[in-house]
């Protein structure tokens, strides 16, 4: 599934590189890791996009190649903390409705929020 098929659509994008961390705000939001072709590899939520991005960059499993390729892009939308659970669940449900499972990297445990 391509990130462009999600509703609501993430409205910002940075490369999934350490150099990009400085471009992220320290606010709540939902995000999607995609490969170079924008195929979804991971869907998540956080109360701090800046910190969460750094955590994912420090998680070897999130940086290794998957069956769909390596994470290249970090798409995100900022949202109030009261809205992020619904946005993330909606994105996961949209993905699962097409593929019958969560994205490949959502199967890897990571620190909460």
State each model region's role.
Residues 70-82:
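Nucleic-acid nuclease catalytic cores
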